[in-house]
Amino acid sequence: MKLHELKPAEGSRKVRNRVGRGIGSGNGKTAGRGHKGQNARSGGGVRLGFEGGQTPLFRRLPKRGFTNINRKEFTIVNLSTLNRFEDGTEVTPELLLETGVISKLNDGVKILASGAVEKKLTVKAHKFSSSAKEAIEAAGGSVEVI
């Protein structure tokens, strides 16, 4: 094999379609835009959600709900991710942040019971699901709500 014999894998390179370059190309003359009309013009086309003058869906449906300004957003950590820590480790939100398990704290950490924990850990967090609490204690660990 020589350098000049190298070829890209089949289908990995696609030649870009140059429109408006003659009839033979299959995309000449109107360049795939059809004849006249709003969509044939430069800058033409309808805005997002426009339905041709008909009352659009988002206005036909009633308003619903509100945004709770006091909503707390917890960073979720599953039990399966706690297995990366050594036996007997005290797992705190600061440690989770340090080790890169979570990227930011938000309003606190909530431990959920997805997966299983096989190690005896002391877990400190802001919230626990009841099944996560049981699983940690069943593995011989302890739970502390901050």
Swiss-Prot record:
Q: Which GO terms describe its molecular function?
A: rRNA binding; structural constituent of ribosome
| Keyword Transmembrane annotated | no
**Which N-terminal residues, if any, form the signal peptide?**
none
Gene Ontology, cellular component aspect? cytosolic large ribosomal subunit
Q: Write out the biased-composition intervals (Basic and acidic residues).
A: 1-13
- Show the segment(s) annotated as Disordered: 1-51
> PROSITE patterns, from UniProt?
RIBOSOMAL_L15
One biological process term from GO is: translation
The subunit field of the Swiss-Prot or TrEMBL record says: Part of the 50S ribosomal subunit.
Please name the PANTHER family in this protein's record: 50S RIBOSOMAL PROTEIN L15 (PTHR12934), LARGE RIBOSOMAL SUBUNIT PROTEIN UL15M (PTHR12934:SF11)
Function recorded in the entry: Binds to the 23S rRNA.
Q: What is this protein called?
A: Large ribosomal subunit protein uL15
> What organism is this sequence from?
Bacillus mycoides (strain KBAB4) (Bacillus weihenstephanensis)
